[in-house]
Amino acid sequence: MKMKFGIISIFPEMFKAINDFGVTARAIKDSKVSISCFNPRDYTTDRHATVDDTSFGGGAGMVMKYQPLSAAIEDAKNTLGCGTKVVYLSPQGSIFNHRKAQELLQNDSLILLCGRYEGVDERLIQDYVDEEISVGDFVLSGGELPAMLVMDSLIRLLPEVLGNKESVVEDSFYDGLLDYPHYTKPAVLPNGNAVPDVLLSGNHKEIAKWRRKQKLIRTYERRKDLIECLCLSAKDKQILDDYKIDKVSTKGEE
């Protein structure tokens, strides 16, 4: 499976980070991913290559123009396929998470529209955008960083991109839970802080049990909202019940 990305951005140079480093660069080198950038400035019709203008009705900030953006999207569709889904990275979109990543992965190609300034002409959204996605409730200068975040998340989920399949399966959110704690050498730090004994035991069954317990506890402590969305097994529920009882009794002893 090869996934194709079309990027609509006035700063295509930013995507060198995806092309040149880490897992994503390796996926591109191995022809599992292709990235094509379409700069709206290349589709303007004036000598100043204007991509933005003032907002009707007044107000601060500039708005990205319909014409150069629509032309860039049309060219991207001609390159990637006329049915390619267009995703606009926008703070008004639905929140991006692991479930959304898996959903987007059903597409062989995606066009990611990166806005700037106050956003894009609303008519462009009406005519071209299939979905708006947000990476969180905060404001950024443009859609390039969110687009790279989405791309990285999708690329690492593609078959055979990661060398070890377990790396994907054991990631946070893969099963709806946060990841368990990780440790590496040395086994004991100079201050005496040591790796849990079970991880040094060589008993893979006990290690798996410990890791499952830690995933459950960590998610319960840090993201109760995730726990509430899961259908936990009776064994998982018992682990959490025991943890809550131990926590209460420990607190009572203090």
UniProtKB/Swiss-Prot annotation:
Claim: tRNA processing is one of the keywords in the record: yes
Highest taxon of source: Bacteria
Any GO BP: tRNA N1-guanine methylation
Subcellular location: Cytoplasm
Reaction(s) the record says it catalyses: guanosine(37) in tRNA + S-adenosyl-L-methionine = N(1)-methylguanosine(37) in tRNA + S-adenosyl-L-homocysteine + H(+)
Residues where S-adenosyl-L-methionine binds: 115, 135-140
Broad class of where this protein is predominantly found: cytoplasm
Pfam families (alphabetical): tRNA_m1G_MT
Keyword Transferase: yes
Top-level EC class as recorded in UniProt: transferase
Enzyme Commission code(s) on record: 2.1.1.228
Cellular component GO terms held in the UniProt record: cytosol
InterPro entries: Alpha/beta_knot_MTases, tRNA_m1G_MeTrfase_C_sf, tRNA_m1G_MeTrfase_TrmD, tRNA_m1G_MTases_N, tRNA_MeTrfase_TRMD/TRM10
Keywords associated with the record: Cytoplasm, Methyltransferase, S-adenosyl-L-methionine, Transferase, tRNA processing
An annotated Gene Ontology molecular function: tRNA (guanine(37)-N1)-methyltransferase activity
NCBIfam families recorded: PRK00026.1, trmD
Subunit record text: Homodimer.
Function: Specifically methylates guanosine-37 in various tRNAs.
Family as reported in the entry's similarity comment: Belongs to the RNA methyltransferase TrmD family.
Protein name: tRNA (guanine-N(1)-)-methyltransferase
Organism listed in the record: Francisella tularensis subsp. tularensis (strain SCHU S4 / Schu 4)
